[in-house]
Amino acid sequence: KKQVTFADIAAYTHFSKTTISRYFNHPDSLTLENQEKISQALDTLGYKKNKLAKVLANGKSEFIGIIIPNLYLHYYSEMLTQLLSSYSDYHYKFLIFSSEHEAEEEQQYIEELLSYQIEGLIVLSHTLSSKQLSSYQIPIVAIEREAEYVSSVTTDNYMGALQATTLLIRDKCDILIHINVNVEKTVPAYDRIRAFKETCEEYQVPYDIDLSVIGNSYQEILNEIRRIFTRIEEKYPNQKKGIFLANDTYANMFLNLIFQKYRELPSFYEIIGFDNSPIASEAILPITTVGQQIDIIAQTAMELLVQQMEEQKKRSPKPLEKPVHKQITPILIRRNTTS
């Protein structure tokens, strides 16, 4: 069947092709009566939108790029799910790359995305600095990463870690242990380490911070968590141990190791994760966690990005004078791994 063209619609409605073009690109410039006539003609003629033609005509692809570090940490997979679900609200499509540690590779990914004329970019990876990202001259929103030069959305990591640490202290743990990576101080998640340390010192409780969790795969991280578990078992026998882990993936791994050894969660262990990703509630024992409101973070990131993209479409766009930074309050969710 022959594809219906603007010329066909113009001939059927007795409007000019310019008027038909205005209907698609600037419908408010037409009267409601003329909009209705054209709409009925589209139904009668069986018109199907040609997205490619629209991109070629106005240079707007309706694509947003996403760069995400990995999908084996449940936080990132849940964040991606929430971002993709925004299609029903904004009708933007997504092009997604996974990038971790390799700056040159990530720059290639961004160049590839730009070649598809993306209208905006959401970045969760930590590879390139925000100063480098800002040089690309497109709307960008960073999520939970260093973002001095671009707009961002983060969780109040300090408050979340404070809530977790305070709960372990109230539950009368003899030793508090925080397991994390060696996070740079410019990264929002560093506040989890800072809040844990400062809270332990304020309440004068013994604490231990292990920043050695590294790995580029699930198996590498599991091996490192196993090593840490063995060290804790040997170093703190006969003590009630309160373990606060950097995320729910680590917490679930640690919990599984405890179950492998004890067939239960003994009274001398308490565990708190961070994120409230699905694995926290799906674990062998539902895990107490600091809930990042991932749905709200994703929604806020999309709102910030769409505002910038819509501004870019104006005849005289006014770019942001300075980046906008939004912080979302976390919620401590008590489950079965604390008293």
Feature-to-residue mapping (PLM):
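Extreme N-terminal segment that seeds HTH/winged-HTH DNA-binding domains in transcriptional regulators
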Residues: K1-F15
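N-terminal helix-turn-helix/winged-helix DNA-binding helices
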Residues: K1-T5, D43-T81, Y90, S115
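Central regulatory/effector-binding core of bacterial HTH transcription factors
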Residues: S85-S130
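Short beta-strand elements in bilobed, periplasmic/extracellular small-molecule ligand-binding domains
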Residues: Y87-S98, K197-L222
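Flexible loop/hinge segments that line or gate small-molecule binding clefts
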Residues: L124-Q163, V183, T249, D275-I287
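Hydrophobic alpha-helical segments within soluble ligand-binding/sensing domains
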Residues: V153-H178, R194-E198, E220-T230, A251, ...
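An alpha-beta-alpha
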Residues: A164-L211, P317-T337
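Flexible loop/turn connectors
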Residues: T230-G242, A246-S339
